[in-house]
């Protein structure tokens, strides 16, 4: 099985687009709308992709990043607005892609992080 990339994304259409991009990069995507614990995922995770966004009500999906253990897999954050970019930096994501222009770097970024 190719390395598993966990996608934390609550919007189905965004999740589907990320899944397609990750599959095209020869990784196995697993998508969850929110994450309580990495132990909930039945496979070893090589990297995490999360869209940082403040939309809707309740806790945003990206809030799960703050609750991860110290030894968590590398996190690639995708953000559009300045406040979202700042939030990704606050969460100490290993890579922050500024959408839409940095999205083309997702494949290259995952390959570098995962090492395949």
Positions of predicted regions on the chain:
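His-Asp phosphorelay/catalytic-motif detector in bacterial-type signaling
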Residues: 68-76
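Alpha4 helix (beta4-alpha4-beta5 surface) of REC/receiver domains from two-component response regulators
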Residues: 79-97
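C-terminal output helix
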Residues: 101-110
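Conserved phosphotransfer microenvironments
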Residues: 15, 36, 45-68, 81
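The C-terminal output helix
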Residues: 111-116
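Conserved acidic segment of CheY-like receiver
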Residues: 2-12, 18-22, 48
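Short, structured coil segments at secondary-structure junctions
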Residues: 25, 71, 90-93
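Short hydrophobic/Thr-rich beta-strand motif most characteristic of the beta2 strand and flanking loop
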Residues: 26-36
């Amino acid at each position: 099985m190719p390395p598993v990339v966990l996608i934390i994304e609550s919007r189905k259409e965004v999740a589907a687009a990320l899944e397609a991009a990750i599959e095209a990069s020869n990784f196995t995507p697993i998508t969850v709308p929110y994450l309580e614990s990495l132990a909930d995922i039945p496979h070893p995770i090589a990297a995490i992709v999360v869209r940082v966004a403040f939309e809707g009500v309740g806790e945003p999906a990206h809030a799960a990043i703050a609750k991860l253990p110290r030894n968590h897999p590398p996190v690639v954050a995708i953000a559009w607005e300045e406040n979202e970019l700042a939030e990704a930096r606050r969460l100490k994501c290993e890579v922050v892609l500024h959408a839409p222009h940095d999205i083309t770097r997702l494949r290259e970024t995952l390959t570098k992080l995962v090492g395949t």
